[in-house]
Amino acid sequence: PNPSPMSRKQAFQFLDLPRTMPTRIPVELRTSGDWGELYGKFDKAEAQYQSGRCLDCGNPYCSWKCPVHNAIPQWLQLVQENRIEEAAALCHSTNPLPEVCGRVCPQDRLCEGSCTLEEFGAVTIGAVEKYIVDTAFKMGWRPDLGNVHPTGHRVAVIGAGPAGLACADRLARAGIEAVVYDRYEQIGGLLQFGIPSFKLDKSVIGKRREILEGLGGRV
């Protein structure tokens, strides 16, 4: 049977909701000493607008193509409902560095490139992920390990690059104290010294250090 006018409208509503990106900082500002991140951030309305474009596919290719299999449709739904802290917790459950991936991950070849809407303009997944974590941190949210029981074990992690930080995060979630060693005072490795500030502001890495120490890790 032919679909009703209402169901047809709902099925194709994404055609009326175009893909949008955060504001790109003007060249004039970027060449006058502002070496901050190239793109701004979504506000609440923009993040909810983009999240609302998600079709909630039965077989979400965005999650499948994501190397860490983020629960993307689920946290997009939480953003629509303004449940930011829950969205941040869900992001952290699969990804120890979501604030980094929201900025520098090649979404066009991974989650966004696999979005069912890609032909019409994929959901701006990376920008929403950045919004979730930055907003949650600003609200004072931190990962909750209240249900984790300390094992009394301590593990040394050599290198405070992305892999070392991710390892320390997962150890903390298993109740193991991680002590991270690095030759440099600043943590981050490639994130700190290899990725320019216009892609990844270094304050983001400083915040990750604070989070790690809050989880009981030491650097």
Question: At which residue positions do the language-model features occur?
Answer:
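Ferredoxin-type iron-sulfur electron-transfer modules and their immediate structural context
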Residues: 1-154
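N-terminal Rossmann-like dinucleotide/flavin-binding domain of flavoprotein oxidoreductases
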Residues: 88-98, 128, 191-219
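Residue-level detector of alpha-helix initiation sites
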Residues: 96, 161-162, 186
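N-terminal export/assembly segments and adjacent metallocofactor-ligating motifs
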Residues: 138, 166, 176, 201, ...
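N-terminal Rossmann-like FAD-binding beta1-loop-alpha1 element of flavoenzymes
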Residues: 153-179
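Glycine-rich FAD pyrophosphate-binding loop
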Residues: 176-192
